[in-house]
């Protein structure tokens, strides 16, 4: 319970009103992958020819990345889910902090700009508040390719070493299979002189999508999707047309929502092997899964407790840890969820407990005793995936829930509530202005009414 006082802090005015205990039924059209589209936008900086991207999701993160490119002089033309990108006349300049703040993917631009123009200045990025996501791997890798890098007042400034006109190939071994570092170094190496070998590379599908587009542009990249990636640098890259892969995280979120509500739905288009770890756990927890071509159907039933441990691809994705925890709160039995990727990605635990779940948390390991039902509440999501988890929990609850923090949700889910509505859920985006006290202390002098408002730290 948070007491409202005269020291007002206005929440974002939009929220979702959700009527719980409804069954999902029907088909969901899965959008293009956010995490792929963002890096493909950065990769468009590698050429002075036009890039046409199809199946681009309509998300606030994509809009932010587009604004970053525009600030550099890139011309963008968008129509529905297609983006035409013209990076011919780029002006190399330090990006304003207000543009990159809140979007970690903005840092992907450094590899592309450095290898094409010989210099780049990018402020340290933001993103969801889910823990430290250091850029050491990016910087060490770029230095191995021949870059001089300094960090001056939270701005990363990179340039070629003296008397060099290009980056040069190198053997690089990452200390951990960082997705962002792997993508940054692939882009930088694509126009470098000679061969680059990246060992302990990340294997995520979004990296494979990046490499497929770069190869269409004339790059020579081998073994993407494996732990060792080989890049032979080329002199120039040209334009191409490329379709963004389906969003495996969005698909997984809807599948988990169906399992949590004992529902039957079909998601498509998807690439089923991108979701293998998730599908295995859903089957283990009692759901029936049917794969046909580029579609996956699920029939949820009798939720059983299962343990998960997040891991780099092809392991269980950290982006679905929070939604899966919402499922496990109403499972029969005890389960354990271990987060190994980010050290601060359990903000949803307190919120789920306020809804009636039984979760104890220690050292990024959540121990969950399943309960029969959760109760509806007014909640504020603190990051993208925890917001999705709260919505799933609200779908299973006994009453009405109000979920705030939609600025997080809109970063990564396109038309989320509309898609749920088409499946039969009573959900509506509403606009109001409510206030909460920034302090967690109860104020006896408050003249404003108390609300059941819980916010993740």
UniProtKB/Swiss-Prot annotation:
Enzyme class: transferase
Catalytically driven reaction(s): phosphoenolpyruvate + UDP-N-acetyl-alpha-D-glucosamine = UDP-N-acetyl-3-O-(1-carboxyvinyl)-alpha-D-glucosamine + phosphate
Record keywords: Cell cycle, Cell division, Cell shape, Cell wall biogenesis/degradation, Cytoplasm, Peptidoglycan synthesis, Pyruvate, Transferase
Keyword tRNA processing recorded: no
Pathways involved: Cell wall biogenesis; peptidoglycan biosynthesis
Gene Ontology MF term list: UDP-N-acetylglucosamine 1-carboxyvinyltransferase activity
Subcellular location, record wording: Cytoplasm
Residue ranges, annotated region (Disordered): 436-457
Main location: cytoplasm
Pfam family, one: EPSP_synthase
Residue sites binding UDP-N-acetyl-alpha-D-glucosamine per the record: 104, 319, 341
Modified residues (2-(S-cysteinyl)pyruvic acid O-phosphothioketal): 128
Transmembrane parts of this sequence: none
GO annotation (BP), single: peptidoglycan biosynthetic process
CDD domains in the cross-refs: UdpNAET
Described purpose of this protein according to its UniProt entry: Cell wall formation. Adds enolpyruvyl to UDP-N-acetylglucosamine.
Similarity comment text for this entry: Belongs to the EPSP synthase family. MurA subfamily.
NCBIfam families: murA (TIGR01072), PRK09369.1 (NF006873)
Protein's UniProt name: UDP-N-acetylglucosamine 1-carboxyvinyltransferase
Organism of origin: Prochlorococcus marinus subsp. pastoris (strain CCMP1986 / NIES-2087 / MED4)
Taxon lineage: Bacteria, Bacillati, Cyanobacteriota, Cyanophyceae, Synechococcales
């Amino acid at each position: 319970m948070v007491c409202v006082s005269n020291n007002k802090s206005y929440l974002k005015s939009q929220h979702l009103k959700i009527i719980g205990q409804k069954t999902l039924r029907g088909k969901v059209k899965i959008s293009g992958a956010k995490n792929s589209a963002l890096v493909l936008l950065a990769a468009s900086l590698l050429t002075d020819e036009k890039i046409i991207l199809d199946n681009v999701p309509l998300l606030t993160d994509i809009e932010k990345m587009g604004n970053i490119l525009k600030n550099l002089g890139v011309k963008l033309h968008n129509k529905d889910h297609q983006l035409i990108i013209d990076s011919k006349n780029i002006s190399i300049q330090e990006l304003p902090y207000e543009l990159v703040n809140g979007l970690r993917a903005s840092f992907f631009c450094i590899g592309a700009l450095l290898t094409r123009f010989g210099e780049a200045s990018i402020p340290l990025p933001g993103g969801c508040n889910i823990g430290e996501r250091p850029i050491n791997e990016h910087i060490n890798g770029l230095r191995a390719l021949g870059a001089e890098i300094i960090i001056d007042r939270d701005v990363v400034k990179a340039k070629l070493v003296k008397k060099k006109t290009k980056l040069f190939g190198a053997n690089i071994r990452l200390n951990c299979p960082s997705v962002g570092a792997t993508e940054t170094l692939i882009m930088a190496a694509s126009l470098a002189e000679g061969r680059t070998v990246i060992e302990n590379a990340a294997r995520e599908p979004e990296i494979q999508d990046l490499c497929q587009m770069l190869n269409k542009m004339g790059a020579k990249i081998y073994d993407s999707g494996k732990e060792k990636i080989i890049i032979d640098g080329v002199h120039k890259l040209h334009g191409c047309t490329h379709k963004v892969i389906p969003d495996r995280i969005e698909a997984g979120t809807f599948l988990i929502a169906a399992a949590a509500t004992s529902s039957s739905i079909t998601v498509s288009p998807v690439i089923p092997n991108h979701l293998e770890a998730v599908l295995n756990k859903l089957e283990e927890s009692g759901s029936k899964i049917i794969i046909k071509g580029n579609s996956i159907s699920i029939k949820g039933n009798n939720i059983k407790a299962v343990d998960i441990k997040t891991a780099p691809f092809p392991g269980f994705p950290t982006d679905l840890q929070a939604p899966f925890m919402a499922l496990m709160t109403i499972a029969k039995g005890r389960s354990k969820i271990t987060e190994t990727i980010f050290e601060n990605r359990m903000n949803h635990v307190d919120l789920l407990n306020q809804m009636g779940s039984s979760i104890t948390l220690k050292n990024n390991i959540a121990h969950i005793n399943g309960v029969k039902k959760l109760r509806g509440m007014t909640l504020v999501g603190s990051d993208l995936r925890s917001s999705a988890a709260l919505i799933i929990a609200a779908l299973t609850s006994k009453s009405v829930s109000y979920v705030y923090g939609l600025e997080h949700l809109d970063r990564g889910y396109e038309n989320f509530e509309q898609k749920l509505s088409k499946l039969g859920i009573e959900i509506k985006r509403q606009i109001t202005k409510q206030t909460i006290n920034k302090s967690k202390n109860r104020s006896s002098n408050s003249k404003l009414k108390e609300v059941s408002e819980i916010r993740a730290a």
